[in-house]
Amino acid sequence: MDVLLTGGTGYIGSRVLDQLRGAGHQVTAVVRSDGAAERVAAAGATPVVGDLTDQAWLADQLRGVDGAVHTASPGDASSPDFDRAVVGAVRAAFGGTSKPYVHTSGLWIYGSGSDLDEDSPLNPPALTGWRPEVEAQVLDSDLVASIVVPAVVYGHGGGLPNLVVDAPRDGSGRLVLIGDGTQHWGVVHVDDTAALYVAVLESGQANGRVLAVTDENPTVADLGEATGSDVVGEPVELTRARLGEAFADALLLDQQFRVSAKASALGWSPQGPTLVNELASGSYAQHG
């Protein structure tokens, strides 16, 4: 399959690129700069430099491929319009065809809860409150579309766990947690996340939302203690001041999940080390 990939130099997208190539697919990677083009070319992709918010241009690129995976995100206030533009181009190019499209969401869209799954009500925090409207454009259309919903992604010393590893210390040298640390995080290794993108794409089906998550569900205090440090909770108002209110409120969500039955039906199961082990003796300990 010839697959158009966005975000091919990113934390998740670079692993998706590697696994697509490993599975024998040809990859056309849309990038924003010549430097990024060199990086994806070195990974075996055909680079195309362009603007993902140019819907007409992107639709033209999409018409020449067999499927697409969208992992790119500016990660700022422009994210809603960015995703709307990409989805608009995909609908123009893939609408009414059998070409599979895989979109990216995030676990925070479900808000706090235990035993959450794909069918749980959406209750996003302010930071990702825009996602349901954009995702409805993906799902309520004539696309063969799926949305991978990654948990807090970890592995290779990257991602949000570094907010715990690199947290400030109090006067006694204790690691300061995000809030009181009792909240659970859904988590997933980045390599397992990439494997799910490939499995969803290769299914050729409209899978709806598919969670990329393990059943580890550590608390933030578990993560802090896994670094080998003594830990101390932080009042919510101080966490909000330190990290920004919207970001902090997302990190303060208390979420618990099981491995997705939908993902399992596609042959997926988590293979990577747990986040607690990664923090204790794996890639984060090595980077620390």
Task: Tell where the protein language model's regions lie, with residue ranges.
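C-terminal amphipathic/interface module of NAD(P)-dependent oxidoreductases
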Residues: 50, 249-288
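N-terminal Rossmann NAD(P)H-binding glycine-rich loop of SDR-like oxidoreductase domains
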Residues: 3-23
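Mid/C-terminal beta-alpha module of Rossmann-like enzyme folds, strongest
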Residues: 2, 196-247, 286-288
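Conserved beta-loop-beta element that borders a ligand/cofactor-binding pocket
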Residues: 135-157
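Glycine/proline-rich active-site loop of Rossmann-fold NAD(P)-dependent oxidoreductases
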Residues: 153-165, 171, 200-210
